[in-house]
Design a protein with these regions (language model features):
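Hydrophobic ligand-binding cavity/cleft-lining segments
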Residues: 1-42, 146
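Well-ordered beta-strand positions in beta-sheet-rich domains
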Residues: 5-7, 62-64, 88-90
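Short alpha-helical
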Residues: 25, 46, 109
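Glycine-rich portal/gate segments that line the openings of hydrophobic small-molecule binding cavities
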Residues: 38-84, 96-101, 132-146
Length: 146
């Protein structure tokens, strides 16, 4: 299926941006649809760690997410498995001083029948969601409470 990606410039160092987006339990602060995240295990966050997520979109959506890549200040990626199949998500960061370019992307790599028959809708919803998420992250990191 298609690969979607967008980027935004944030006035914050890469280490701060990375710390925020790589904290999976805080994704509900910027993601839409009432996302709730529960960590499945203990110990330091690392590739292979799993999380359970619940969101409200067309009913309750439950997914299992596994961290696929964690490279400090550079990349945070995870795979989510749920009603749409397996979707690979990522953040890529490029920082220079107090400014960071943050990219966010998603690609359905193992779609279910549901994902295939709704691909026309997903091809609109996913890019809109990525754009909204990036704007919310920027607002949080640059806002007065930052």
């Amino acid at each position: 299926m298609k690969r979607f990606e967008d980027r935004i410039s944030i006035h914050a160092p890469a280490s701060r941006v990375f710390g925020y987006v790589s904290d999976f339990t805080r994704h509900g602060e910027w993601a839409g649809n009432g996302l709730e995240v529960t960590r499945s295990g203990a110990g330091p966050v690392a590739a292979g760690m799993t999380f359970s997520t619940t969101a409200k979109q067309f009913g309750t959506q439950r997914e299992q997410s596994t961290i696929a890549e964690l490279t400090p200040d550079t990349t945070f990626a995870w795979d989510s498995t749920g009603a749409l199949g397996r979707v690979h998500h990522w953040f890529a960061l490029s920082g220079e001083g107090d400014s960071t370019t943050l990219s966010k992307g998603a690609e359905t790599v193992d779609p279910t029948f549901l994902a295939k028959i709704t691909s026309w809708k997903l091809s609109k919803d996913i890019p809109n969601g990525i754009h909204r998420d990036l704007a919310n992250i920027k607002a949080h990191l640059e806002g007065p409470a930052a």
